């Protein structure tokens, strides 16, 4: 079976080409276009050529007078020509930014400006080869479906043929669009054309739809002055009267004024004034936005120098609202100061009312903490006359425990805390009486001891304690020992018992204790002792003559616990004084011999309680 194609009538019919161009234009603009094409694609020329396609029958499914269905193999290598016109984007950065999310783009101004160039593309030397399913019916028209991609090759000629990479890019993009056209859009175009040729009902329906969608421009036009706004103004903001509106017409030779509603004009003016982004005297520059003015000072320096009372400045608007609010109470001053940096409420009076309520409700809760009272029901011993007589000495010993807390805690496992008198508040004792009393008495006791020592001060002074001992007392400037004192200490390291009362070692001015001789009683040494060991006392010193009588009187007059506590404190004080004296004497003697450092000496253990 053979078919004879009559290709010449298609070329002779001018109406066919017009309808085909319109359908192709609609099809090319319907599909998603690449971002480089920024204008509509218009088909300006369409010519099917003189060479018809070649068809090979593969299968016939249905054959009748008014219908036909078959599968063909089509081959076309004719002289058809298709010319398109559009506009393309020549700036690749603009194309890149259009295809990306605005959050990830750097938002350039000048570099991303579009550069539109007109483009004319001519498609020729089209070669097609594929399998076609053809269905014909007088009632339903012709349906052509391609089972595979029919496009083999195509020649693209454009205005950018002199630029190789642009030519290759256009070639690839147009081939991709034509493949979509043959597979999706071309069957629909052929079907609509066949319905126009053979179905009169469809042609009448399509004509009616065109009249509805594209109404004719013939006839009188609509007069915009027929229904003017209620409060019209001209372009300068002047209100127009009814007579002036009636004098205006579309056919008048006078210049046409733009009519605006006065309410809308005021809203637009307020919006423009509040933003302050452009000045009226600034020349218009494309793709440029000026920054907003930051305050009234910059507004006054601007070209106009006018500030509209209708709209406050753009910056710190809430601050102006807060300043204009009503005066608040004294409790709300802190709240008002902190609220000036936050957005204010719509009503200044209401904001002050809310602040005063909040401040009054929470002012008492945060003013002071509630005092927790603890009632002490334990029995307290009343001070006796003997204890009252030696109150000065007991206060001295109370202060010494604070200075020797660290050393005493490491040597003795138990400590006895003296009782205190709470005469100020007998019902509510303080939380920590020992700590508070020591803090209060420390400075006063030191001054008392310094005054007591000033009366007994002699001219003999020793050098300051080395820094390696880590004493907490501030050192006063001291004078070096005389040479005769140093020689006497070196030659007689162990004084006789009868001379122990007259011997006084070098004193430390800043220690809060009295002068206590550090050389205890002991038998005289038969052999001379080295200078490095001359400052160390024997292991078991006697405390009867090494402590002031005041300590012993307190111990005899007090109870057993007080006596034990006093003896413990006295032994601790004696140990510290002996260490200080031995370090001072060793530093002077060892400096001449070159031996006897701090780490070379061994400290004696603290003495035990006296039995």
Curated annotation (Swiss-Prot):
Query: Which cysteines are cross-linked by disulfides?
Result: none
Membrane topology term reads:
Multi-pass membrane protein
Q: Where is the SMP-LTD domain?
A: 1-195
Compartments, as annotated in UniProt: Mitochondrion outer membrane
Q: Which UniProt keywords apply?
A: Lipid transport, Lipid-binding, Membrane, Mitochondrion, Mitochondrion outer membrane, Transmembrane, Transmembrane beta strand, Transport
**Residue ranges under compositional bias (Basic and acidic residues)?**
374-385, 444-459
Q: Where is the composition biased (Pro residues)?
A: 520-529
Is Cytoplasm one of the keywords? no
Q: Which domain of life is it from?
A: Eukaryota
Which InterPro entries does this entry report, sorted A to Z? Mdm34, SMP_LBD
What the record says about its domains?
Lacks alpha-helical transmembrane segments, suggesting that it resides in the membrane via beta-sheet conformations similar to those predicted for other outer membrane proteins and porin.
Subunit and partners: Component of the ER-mitochondria encounter structure (ERMES) or MDM complex, composed of MMM1, MDM10, MDM12 and MDM34.
Could you tell me what this protein is called? Mitochondrial distribution and morphology protein 34
Which species does this protein come from?
Paracoccidioides brasiliensis (strain Pb18)
Q: Gene encoding this chain?
A: MDM34
């Amino acid at each position: 079976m053979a078919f004879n194609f009559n290709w010449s009538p298609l070329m002779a019919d001018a109406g066919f080409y017009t309808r085909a161009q319109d359908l192709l234009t609609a099809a090319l603009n319907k599909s998603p276009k690449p971002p480089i094409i920024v204008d509509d694609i218009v088909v300006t020329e369409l010519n099917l050529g003189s060479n018809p396609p070649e068809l090979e029958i593969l299968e016939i499914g249905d054959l009748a007078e008014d219908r036909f269905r078959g599968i063909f193999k089509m081959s076309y290598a004719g002289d058809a020509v298709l010319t398109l016109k559009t506009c393309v984007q020549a700036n690749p950065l603009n194309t890149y930014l259009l295809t990306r999310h605005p959050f990830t783009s750097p938002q350039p101004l000048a570099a991303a400006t579009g550069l539109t160039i007109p483009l004319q593309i001519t498609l020729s030397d089209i070669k097609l080869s594929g399998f076609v399913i053809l269905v014909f019916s007088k009632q339903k028209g012709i349906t052509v479906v391609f089972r595979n991609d029919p496009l083999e090759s195509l020649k693209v000629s454009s205005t950018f043929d002199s630029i190789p990479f642009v030519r290759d890019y256009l070639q690839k993009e147009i081939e991709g669009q034509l493949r979509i056209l043959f597979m999706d859009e071309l069957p629909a175009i052929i079907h609509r054309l066949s319905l126009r040729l053979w179905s009169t009902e469809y042609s009448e329906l399509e004509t009616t739809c065109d009249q509805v969608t594209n109404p004719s421009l013939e006839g009188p036009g609509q007069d915009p002055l027929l229904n003017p706004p209620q409060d019209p103004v001209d372009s300068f903001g002047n209100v127009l009267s009814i007579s002036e509106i009636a004098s205006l017409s579309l056919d008048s030779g006078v210049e046409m004024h733009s009519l605006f509603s006065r309410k809308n004009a005021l809203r637009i003016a307020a919006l423009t004034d509040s933003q302050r982004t452009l000045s009226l005297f600034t020349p218009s520059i494309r793709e440029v936005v000026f920054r907003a003015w930051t305050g009234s000072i910059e507004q006054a320096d601007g070209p106009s120098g006018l500030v509209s009372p209708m709209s406050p400045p753009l910056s710190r608007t809430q601050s102006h609202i807060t300043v204009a609010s009503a005066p608040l109470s004294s409790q709300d001053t802190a709240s008002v100061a902190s609220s000036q940096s936050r957005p204010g409420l719509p009503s200044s009076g209401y904001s002050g009312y809310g602040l005063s309520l909040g401040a009054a409700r929470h002012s008492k809760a945060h003013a002071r903490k509630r005092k927790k009272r603890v009632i002490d029901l334990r029995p307290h011993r009343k001070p006796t006359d003997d204890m009252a007589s030696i109150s000065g000495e007991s206060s001295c010993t109370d202060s010494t425990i604070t200075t020797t807390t660290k050393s005493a805690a490491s040597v003795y496992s138990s400590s006895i805390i003296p009782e205190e008198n709470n005469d100020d508040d007998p019902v509510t004792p303080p939380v920590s009486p020992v700590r508070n009393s020591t803090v209060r008495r420390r400075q006063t006791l030191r001054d008392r001891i310094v005054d007591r020592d000033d009366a007994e001060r002699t001219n003999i002074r020793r050098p300051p304690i080395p820094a390696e001992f880590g004493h907490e007392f501030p050192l006063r400037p001291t004078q070096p020992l005389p040479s005769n004192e140093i020689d006497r200490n070196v030659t007689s390291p162990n004084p006789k018992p009868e001379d122990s009362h007259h011997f006084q070692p070098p004193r430390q001015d800043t220690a809060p204790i009295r002068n206590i001789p550090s050389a205890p009683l002991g038998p005289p040494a038969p052999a001379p002792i080295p200078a490095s060991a001359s400052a160390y006392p024997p292991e078991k010193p006697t405390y009867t003559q090494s402590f002031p009588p005041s300590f012993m009187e307190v111990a005899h007059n007090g109870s057993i616990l007080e006596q034990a506590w006093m003896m413990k404190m006295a032994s601790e004080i004696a140990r510290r004084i002996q260490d200080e004296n031995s370090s001072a004497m060793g530093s002077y003697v060892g400096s001449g011999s070159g031996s006897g450092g701090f780490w070379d000496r061994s400290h004696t253990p603290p003495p035990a309680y006296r039995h």
